[in-house]
Amino acid sequence: MLLAALCCLLWSFRTSTGHFPRACASSKSLMEKECCPPWSGDGSPCGQLSGRGACQDIILSNAPFGPQFPFTGVDDRESWPSVFYNRTCQCFGNFMGFNCGNCKFGFWGQNCTEKRLLVRKNIFDLSVPEKNKFLAYLTLAKHTTSPDYVIPTGTYGQMNNGSTPMFNDINIYDLFVWMHYYVSRDTLLGGSEIWKDIDFAHEAPGFLPWHRLFLLLWEQEIQKLTGDENFTIPYWDWRDAKSCDICTDEYMGGRNPANPNLLSPASFFSSWQIVCTRLEEYNSRQALCDGTPEGPLLRNPGNHDKARTPRLPSSADVEFCLSLTQYESDSMDKAANFSFRNTLEGFASPLTGIADASQSSMHNALHIYMNGTMSQVPGSANDPIFLLHHAFVDSIFEQWLRRHHPLREVYPEANAPIGHNRESYMVPFIPLYRNGDLFISSRDLGYDYSNLQESERDIFQDYIKPYLEQASRIWPWLIGAAVVGCVVTAVLGGLTSLLCRRNRKQLHEEKQPLLMEKEDYHSLLYQTHL
């Protein structure tokens, strides 16, 4: 019933977040390299007449990259998005979006002047209606074609430099699956040649900012799709977990009793079709994923390679990560030592901070543990557990930011792997965002985590508690001292008052005349005689 009601609402809302805007997928836009669609509010490009933004040239950073990618001009993702567009909407103030029709994260209202903070909750703290609504929203997104975005099915060269556009429609959920595939796919070098050592969202500094933006845009898309502006992605706190406690039909899908690699037929997700998982096939054809369904969602949690991932992360592992003071270090890739990012991502040991190619820990451990669709990087976002998992990873990132208060300059400006420098635009997002733009507190982006709000209260209580205990121990002495002080003050006050009166009396007598007036003198004589 809830799903049907949501479907009825669908066309009342327009989405505006993602990859290639439908309005910019024409041969004219591609050949002119301009993506500045009109805003529906006034019909002008980028809402310029209303002061929302303007169509401007894209300024690219010229900071050098690391040595991991030795090519130039062979991948559409290089110097993003310059292969496709060199002019896009640059929005003003609190406006955002490919046509400046949205508000920046954390701002709301017709003119984007209202600021508010949304809270992401632990999935196990959701009420039954909240949990069911979340599952229904996922299903709705899976069955709704994106009205504003399309995906390219060929490279810019295969499109004859834009003169022959190659784009497909895709549903809203799979749009984000496709984004995760596209950002992490191999480079197609022509013929049968490929280059695997490249990833614009993993194994380098941009890992955490990229996935932070991915979740924010996904969250915003669901808010617009459903009209539920208070919607937030729940997180799964997997610390110290002994098994996949969200892998039940009540939550993210139990195990199929007939085939342990499939989901239970009672699950919302057992009928889902996955996309963008056949990387070797795409590479052999020098092609891109086109969004064609590729079979059911696979998951077999716990039956993974235990030599590589002996256990799920512990609370101590998380605390060790948070204790690391360097965001990035050394080569700034998966070989980096004592790097918070590399340790949290799972390429360095959460016991020592030393990179270990034989182990997959922390974030990576959860992907390996799921032993299915989620275990291969490009197509891992097919599994909705991906969202819950990365929301918790983002909460750890947020804890680190609050604990160490790094400046934006802490994020590497140069020499990171391609696409990961501070001023590099993140692939494949339009509108454009730099890696450094997301290296800020979540509260500045309009959201928080329920566990962090609680921990901050606990920190305050832990700070003030020793002083309260000391006060409680000396409280009787303080009361006694106060009483004694009052008594002493009263006595001293009384003595002081008495002395003052005596002094005034003596002073009065001293001021009497030594000789009386004549009349007084005679009167005194009269009295004496009597």
UniProtKB/Swiss-Prot annotation:
The keyword Transferase does not apply. Residues 19-473 are lumenal, melanosome. Keywords: Copper, Glycoprotein, Melanin biosynthesis, Membrane, Metal-binding, Monooxygenase, Oxidoreductase, Signal, Transmembrane, Transmembrane helix. It is a single-pass type I membrane protein. Residues 1-18 form the signal peptide. GO terms for molecular function: metal ion binding; tyrosinase activity. Its main location: membrane. Binds 2 copper ions per subunit. One of its GO terms (biological process) is melanin biosynthetic process. Glycosylated. PANTHER family: TYROSINASE, TYROSINASE FAMILY MEMBER. Belongs to the tyrosinase family. This is Tyrosinase. It comes from Canis lupus familiaris.
